[in-house]
Amino acid sequence: MTALTPVRSAGTATPQIAPSIRAVGTEDKREICAITRATVQAAIEVLAGTRPIHQLARRLDERCLTALQHRAALIRHESARSPRKLGGLHRNPAVRSVRACEVTPDIYEASAVVIDELRTRAVAVRLERSKQVWRVTALEIG
């Protein structure tokens, strides 16, 4: 007795993913991109001295908030000391693009490109969900 298995071409097998799972992942990714865009914009404005650091206290964890505050203080100190205006380096920043990647269902890593009048910067962000709230646990501004 011979058993024959039907042969399928390589392009016909498509993995079936439940629509509810796909929708949740897509919705999380949209939310992560929106949070990243707003957080990066605010962080660049903090460095420029046009936004107070406390506005990011709910979004950033303590370590990120302290590091950003320290960097902003260094920039302010250096611009006060320098004869040329360093504050002009951060004028009119705009977040041009945001990309996000799921590490686990509760952890995402994202990158953003920020352009201002004189330079383009890359920003990397790690977001972790705790008690249904996304918080930035790592923020690297290039």
Residue ranges: model-predicted function:
Residues 1-47, 76-77, 81-95, 100-103, ...:
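Juxtamembrane and targeting peptides
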Residues 38, 47-51, 61, 65:
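Hydrophobic ligand-binding cavity/cleft-lining segments
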Residues 97-100, 111, 123-127:
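Hydrophobic/aromatic beta-strand elements that line small-molecule binding cavities or substrate pockets
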Residues 109-115:
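Short beta-strand segments that buttress and anchor functional surface loops
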Residues 120-142:
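Short beta-strand edge/turn micro-motifs at domain boundaries
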